[in-house]
Amino acid sequence: AMPFRTLLAVQAEARPEHYRTAEAFRERVFALLEPLSGTPAPRLAAFPELFGLPLLLHLDGGLAPKALLLDPLLPWRRARRAYGVFLEVMAEAARAFGAYLLAGSLLSPPYEEELARGRFSRTPFFQNLALFFNPKGRLLAQVPKMELTPPERWLRRGRFGPHLVETEAGKV
């Protein structure tokens, strides 16, 4: 394994307009990864924690408290949609820039894909999940945050599982 030759720590301010549509989010992610263009491989880019959280709040129109009263399942539907957009955009970006991508995190139940069932979640609990992609855009790991800060105590803690991932540059 050769070490990563290009490392990019993305610094980004979260502004609602970057999260209102899938297209706006895609443009933002690609703009933030632009410094990777023309750099030597293997590349690793890391987004800040909770980079994906505003998708839950702003995607397809803001989350109105009144809507929550009318529809208690709304957070789960919104999380599923936000997770889908986050996953697709980040996978596409990993492929486009040929980079391993640690895609910040979002609050969501952890989803899995199966051919027969499509996308489903084994647990209804929200976790602070970081997604890790390879340069082909494949999701290698969903890593739940281990140590929760006090406001996050209502989230389900991540159990420590097989979160070491083999890359061209060794284990991450």
Where is each model-derived feature located?
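Catalytic metal-binding/acid-base residues of hydrolase active sites
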Residues: E13, F51, L106-L107
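A short acidic, glycine-rich active-site loop
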Residues: A67-E88
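Transmembrane beta-barrel domains of bacterial outer-membrane proteins
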Residues: A22, R28-V29
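Active-site catalytic loop in hydrolytic enzyme cores
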Residues: P109-V172
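Active-site beta-strand/loop signature of hydrolases that rely on acidic residues for catalysis
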Residues: L7, F30-L63, L68, P72, ...
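Active-site-proximal beta-strand elements of phosphoester/diester hydrolases
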Residues: P3-A22, L129, Q142-K145, G170-V172
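A short, hydrophobic beta-strand-centered structural micro-motif
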Residues: Y83-Y111
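Short catalytic/ligand-binding loop motif for oxyanion handling, primarily in non-cytosolic enzymes
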Residues: E17, L53-L56, P109-E113
